[in-house]
Amino acid sequence: KIYRTLLCGSLLLFSLGFSSCEDYLDKEADSTVSEEEAFKNFRNFQGFIEEIYNCIPDKEKNNYTTSWNWGDDEIFNPEGDSHMTHQVDLGNFRAWSTNNQCWLYRTGSDPTATYHPNSDGNAKFKHSLWPHAWYCIRKANIGIANLERLTEATDEEKKLIAGQLYFFRAWWHFEMMQYFGGLPYIDTVLSATEKMSLPRLSYQECADKAAVDFRMAADLLPINWDNTTVGKQTAGKNDLRINKIMALGYLGKNY
């Protein structure tokens, strides 16, 4: 009788646990956002772009000391032998990919990490150029491919969205070109199953492609977001929004 009771109890607990797990793992229909919904209006589309802004690595705060003067003669920290500034002096140019000491590459990089003093104080260490660049270039290409879905928007709103996307596609390529020279310029949405066989371009070829995107962005973006209908909703807080001056500045710096 005791064994029978234990067996029945075990079966009951097992069935309850199984049904509980099944309910927990079931995906709610409302949790999947369709492309039509994600890109239909300015607010939704801008939310998609915000993550690209968030991914920009802070080169001054990505480590406990700055790391910007690689290959120069200045000594910024006599004890910082593992830092890239010293590693470049030693000729160890590949240390950026292994020592986890700079903004060019960090393991554990997370596009969704946001810094707040009371939450994740290490979020500033979770943004780095190499992994985020490819992630954001893909996001920009997805956005550009879905511009036609932006149907509930004014002409001004459409230009703001498109301008930011073209700028960021060029900017992430430009940032990598400074350190790696020519590389494939990704201007389409690549399939997850597609073989990566794009040719490596020369620096000049990459710069030419980036210039087209920077020029497009400059033509679409305003000088001052505060003077736009959309920008008036966040007046005084638009200083870091990508604008025409930034696009033209990088267009010139690109060469």
Can you name each region flagged by the protein language model?
Residues 166, 248-254:
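TPR/Sel1-like alpha-solenoid repeat signature
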Residues 1-30:
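Bacterial Sec-dependent N-terminal signal peptides
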Residues 42, 46, 54-60, 88-180, ...:
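Conserved, well-structured interaction surfaces
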Residues 24, 53, 79-85, 133-136, ...:
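Long, intrinsically disordered, low-complexity segments
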Residues 25, 33, 38-39, 115, ...:
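Short clusters of hydrophobic/aromatic residues that line enzyme substrate/ligand-binding pockets
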Residues 177-189:
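Short, well-structured active-site flanking segments
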Residues 36, 59-87, 186-188, 222-247:
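Short, surface-exposed recognition loops and adjoining beta-strand edges that mediate ligand/DNA contacts
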Residues 21-78:
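Membrane-proximal, proline-rich intrinsically disordered regions
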